[in-house]
Design a protein with these regions (language model features):
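Short beta-strand-to-loop acidic/aromatic patch adjacent to the donor-nucleotide binding site
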Residues: 127-141
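Short, acidic, metal-binding catalytic loop of nucleotide-sugar glycosyltransferases
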Residues: 62-76
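Short beta-strand/loop segment that forms part of the nucleotide-sugar
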Residues: 75-85, 99-100
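Juxtamembrane C-terminal module of membrane proteins
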Residues: 23-45, 67-69, 284, 289, ...
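Acidic donor-binding loop at a coil-to-helix junction in glycosyltransferase catalytic cores
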Residues: 229-235
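Catalytic donor-sugar/metal-binding loop of nucleotide-sugar-dependent glycosyltransferases
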Residues: 237-254
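Long helical/loop segments within the catalytic core of UDP-sugar-dependent glycosyltransferases
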Residues: 104-124, 146-228, 265, 269-280
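N-proximal low-complexity "stem/linker" segments adjacent to membrane-targeting elements
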Residues: 1-62
Length: 413
């Protein structure tokens, strides 16, 4: 048994991170609830743009139907942009845009489609301050509140948290696990997006699902970056770098988690290398933002490893600390577990799950069950991303924007 010396401060510093993150999440959420500025009278039209390769016709059609069912009060249009060779008979879409196969520009794949639609809006005179654009992927559904706040937000660029609550944790053990491995996404939004986007206006993370900007913002930043992935992070950090006004609001952009472990790895592989390419290329992503993202990766790796090591030493009695530090450790441990339970509690709720479980006892029982499951799985959901990142890094850079299957027999769509 060793009595802790000065070196234990390194372990204790790692234990303090969950306390700091809890403070950030509470502060950011309260700030968004009280300080998010709205001015709907400044805007005349909302364009909700759904980007898809074209394989998820049924899922996209469902999203269109849901949005129309909201009976939104603002003037809006739904644009669907897709690749050639797929169905184009979307009902309720105001614009169906097929990107020509021979269209060329600096970015490729999804960012190429964004580039093409941007040029169309410029030609039509829609690159204006009074036009709002909301980017939606083929697996995502903005809640009614999300659309209303995104449209009304008096910002050049804004968004709310991503919540994987569409068919959350159903359809077999793989999707149950993949859903909970998406809990850190919502956790990062609630903790870091709420503060870096909402309070500081200097984003550390940016997600393309639900990103809401003005037509003027799109034309100011543009989609001419030489990128394959991480188009959202590149766009958002460049907007902040050029002094555009960032905002964050409390409403859910609802998405579907990967259905299998294989699809999960494909998705993370694309994300990791998109970030690496952006961080390395200072002509694409501002150097200081790239450095911040890199440091966050390193801190996450080191702190998680040291924390697991420290927990083992403390619980096994190899090292002994004072009762005060012991209490600090248990407080931090409790907050760490709660920080994964809260996203699961949110993801297990919402309108998508109310539709699946109309009886109150099923709805609330599911929320409680998933929150408890997330608490028990905290070591897995915290540690697994480290292993996934290592695997994806050594797998090498993907040459294309890898798309995963979003629909499944369990959706009933």
């Amino acid at each position: 048994v060793y009595h802790a010396g000065n070196w234990i401060l390194i372990i204790l510093a790692s234990f303090l991170i969950p306390i700091l993150e809890a403070a950030l999440a509470v502060t950011g959420t309260l700030y968004a609830a009280t300080q998010f500025k709205t001015a709907p009278e400044k805007f005349s039209l909302l364009i909700i743009q759904i980007a898809t390769v074209g394989r998820e016709y049924e899922l996209v059609q469902t999203t269109i139907n849901k949005i129309h069912a909201y009976q939104l009060s603002m003037p809006y249009q739904i644009w669907v942009v897709l690749e050639p060779g797929f169905r184009t008979d979307y009902q309720g879409a105001d614009e169906i845009i097929v990107v020509p196969a021979d269209y060329t520009c600096p970015p490729v794949d999804k960012a190429r489609a964004l580039n093409y639609c941007w040029k169309i809006r410029v030609e039509r005179g829609l690159a204006r301050q009074d036009i709002k654009l909301m980017y939606v992927d083929d697996d995502t559904l903005p809640s009614r509140r999300y659309i209303e706040l995104g449209y009304a937000g008096d910002y050049d660029i804004c968004q709310g948290p991503t919540i994987p609550n569409r068919w959350y944790a159903i359809g077999g053990w793989q999707h149950f696990l993949m859903s909970h491995l998406d809990d850190p996404r919502a956790r990062n939004c609630l903790t870091y997006c709420s503060t870096t986007q909402g309070i500081l206006g200097k984003p550390l993370f940016v997600h393309g699902e639900g990103l809401t900007i003005t037509g003027w913002t799109e034309n100011r930043i543009g989609w001419d970056f030489h990128i394959v992935g991480s188009d959202d992070l590149v766009f958002g950090t460049n907007a902040a770098h050029q002094g555009l006004k960032w905002g964050y609001f409390n409403a859910a952009i609802q998405l579907v988690s990967p259905w299998t472990w294989k699809e999960h790895l494909k998705q993370r592989h694309r994300w990791l290398w998109g970030n690496i390419d952006a961080i390395k290329n200072h002509t694409v992503m501002p150097k200081n933002y790239g450095l911040a993202v890199f440091i966050k990766y390193i801190i996450g790796f080191v702190a998680t490893a040291i924390s697991f090591f420290g927990i083992t030493l403390l619980q096994s009695g190899v090292i002994v600390v004072s009762p005060t530090l012991q209490n600090l450790f248990y407080t931090s441990l409790a907050l760490w577990v709660v920080s994964y339970m809260v996203p699961a509690w949110i993801a297990a709720g919402g309108e998508p799950n109310r539709e699946l479980r109309p009886q109150w006892w099923r709805y609330w029982g599911f929320k409680i069950t998933q929150a408890l499951a997330a608490g028990l799985m905290t070591p897995i959901t915290a540690f697994a991303p480290m292993l996934v990142i290592i695997y994806c890094y050594f797998r090498g850079r993907p040459e294309r924007f890898v798309v995963i299957a979003k629909n499944n027999k369990f959706t009933g769509v």
